[in-house]
């Protein structure tokens, strides 16, 4: 995978598996130039651009904006495609984008059940085209019915899925209150997410955003064992919308990418395992597709 053109020649590769064009902050939309600078600041050498469609366009850029950025910065970005599964043209939109260079489907963040007929159409396309699918799980809001997601994994063993967001990471604990988007305190062993990662070779975990950061910081003792168990299934990603790598433009005042990389480095002293999570696992999912 080609590095950012202005990264240090000897820089260790870091793949950010979750970024967006025109990402809305608390004050403005981030420009392409700000995104590129943000990634360089965090040492990222390649990024996966996840498109939005439908309601998501109020927060981030569409398929066309991702394609344009990939074209304008060769070697620095690859892109996934998005479409609203409720629209009759969804599969055609996705298929067309894949034929024009998209190498995955996502971010899929829509108010449908994860096992709905609309989503099955998308999974079948992913199976047909051999591309991964990234899903945002949020209780009673997006890709609902997480407890039934196991049946999807069974039905599409050749499709690589990537789980993301609050209900995905909250379910590392067996005692999750599903209404609690960012649970704190000790994790109770036996959570559904932990088991799915253990039992199914076709599911991976996207460590991005506040939900991913919370998952690896709320209970450091659990997190150490969790990362050790799933070191070949976890993918570093940021989903960070700050303007400058220092928290600019955000209500929280910090950069998720910077903070999550630091937390991961603290939890993973083994350099080989760290490299696996920040580059190799994600690169393996993109293998054969990334330019």
Name each model-derived stretch:
Residues 1-64:
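An N-terminally biased module of ancient metal coordination in phosphate/nucleic-acid-related enzymes
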Residues 5, 169-171, 175-291:
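H/E-rich (His + Asp/Glu) clusters that bind or coordinate divalent metals
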Residues 13-15, 133, 161, 236:
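Residue-level marker for buried hydrophobic side chains located in beta-strands
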Residues 17-29, 78-88, 111-112, 179:
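Active-site mouth loops of central-metabolism enzymes
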Residues 18-22, 136, 164-165:
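Histidine-centered divalent metal-coordination motifs
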Residues 46, 54, 60-147, 204, ...:
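Active-site gating/metal-coordination segments in enzymes
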Residues 59-67, 89-96, 115-122, 142-156, ...:
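Distinct, well-ordered alpha-helical segments
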Residues 73, 128-129, 156-157, 199-200, ...:
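Helix C-cap/helix->beta junction micro-motif
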């Amino acid at each position: 995978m080609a590095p950012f053109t202005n990264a240090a020649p000897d820089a260790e590769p870091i793949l950010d598996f979750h970024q967006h064009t025109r990402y809305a902050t608390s004050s403005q939309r981030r420009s392409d130039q700000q995104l590129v600078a943000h990634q360089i600041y965090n040492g990222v050498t390649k990024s996966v651009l996840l498109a939005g469609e439908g309601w998501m366009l109020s927060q981030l850029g569409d398929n066309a904006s991702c394609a344009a950025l990939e074209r304008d910065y060769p070697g620095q970005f690859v892109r996934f495609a998005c479409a609203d599964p409720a629209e009759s043209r969804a599969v055609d939109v996705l298929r067309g984008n894949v034929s024009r260079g998209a190498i995955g489907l996502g971010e899929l963040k829509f108010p449908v059940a994860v096992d709905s007929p609309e989503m099955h159409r998308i999974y079948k396309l992913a199976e047909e085209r051999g591309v991964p699918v990234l899903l945002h799980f949020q209780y009673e809001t997006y890709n609902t019915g997480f407890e039934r997601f196991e049946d999807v994994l069974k039905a599409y063993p050749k499709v690589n899925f990537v789980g993301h967001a609050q209900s995905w990471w909250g379910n590392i604990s067996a005692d999750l209150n599903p209404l609690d988007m960012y649970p704190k305190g000790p994790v109770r062993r036996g959570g559904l997410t932990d088991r799915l990662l253990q039992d199914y070779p076709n599911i991976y975990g996207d460590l991005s955003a506040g939900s991913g950061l919370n998952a690896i910081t709320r209970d450091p003792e659990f997190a150490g064992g969790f990362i050790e168990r799933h070191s070949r299934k976890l993918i570093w990603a940021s989903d960070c919308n700050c303007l400058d790598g220092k928290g600019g433009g955000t209500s929280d005042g910090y950069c998720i990418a910077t903070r999550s990389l630091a937390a991961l480095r603290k939890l993973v002293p083994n350099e080989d395992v760290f490299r696996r999570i920040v580059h190799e696992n994600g690169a393996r999912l993109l293998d054969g597709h990334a330019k």
